[in-house]
Amino acid sequence: MCLAHANSAPQVQQVPGYFLQPVGNLKVTALFDGELGLPRSDLLGISSEKANQLFAQNFIPVDEHNHILTDFSAYLVQTPTQNILIDAGTAKCFGPSLGYVRENLKKAGVRPEQIDTILVTHAHPDHLCGITLDGKMAYPNAKVYLAKADVDYWTSTLNEAKANDFFKPLFKMARDALKPYQQAGRLVAFTQASFKVPNVEVIATQGHTEGHTSYLVDGKNGQKFLGLGDVVHYAAVQFPYPEASYKPDTDARRAIAVRKDIFEQAYQKQWWIGAAHVSFPGIGHIGKNTQGYQWIPAQYRLLK
């Protein structure tokens, strides 16, 4: 036995927070942004007893407040001609346990200036704040795409004045994140009819926010990848019980209908999914079992 090895300090760092999954001719890389506890009380439409049973059965970790520890991820999608980022993470908007997308992008071998397109699913800080770094464009060569409905709503001072204490700070965060791209003419506030990005189709998934959008990227040969956004927050519960909703949803009824519809589409069409709040890397498929829908995570594979 080598005493030098026996007495050396143990490894205390986690492996880099990225995971590469080929999808047809795409290279999809999950980028870990961090983790945060979501309150159990924000899960609605299901009894607390049933929800807690599902959390326990799935060994879901909790934080010091007994909140459900939830992963936050963004997705790099590389086509033969594009470097697309689906969501950009939190940056400094939500504290030290989040904000690692840009760092993990670089660890994955891609420089921020190589990103040409950022597709933001919605204007909440954990998806939007990361486009900006210290008041400047964090991705200086990228165009940012965000649904016009979300741009209009989350930059409005009138809506800000009417918002409750939970949502009120999010308006300034959205304006600050978007500002440098607006000033540079690099923000595209799109409608479903006006959206034009090669190889990408928008799927309207409103409910969580006014303009929430999922992005379906064509990997050819029948392979497609869906950047889902916030259709799911509590995976252990909302896959088998998609009628369970999340308190901050703008329109819970619509969010539930969207969740059921997109789960069925993804199941029938066998799309690859990138789910921002499913356990990292959040890449996999949606299947079915006797309870309902189920999450089937991607397997770690050798790259060829």
PLM feature spans:
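Divalent metal-coordination and catalytic microenvironments
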Residues: 25, 77, 87, 115, ...
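Active-site metal-binding loops of divalent metal-dependent hydrolases
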Residues: 33-34, 88-91, 123, 149-150, ...
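Active-site metal-binding motif and surrounding structural segment of the metallo-beta-lactamase
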Residues: 73-74, 96-145
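Cap/insert and terminal regions of metallo-dependent hydrolase folds
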Residues: 216-304
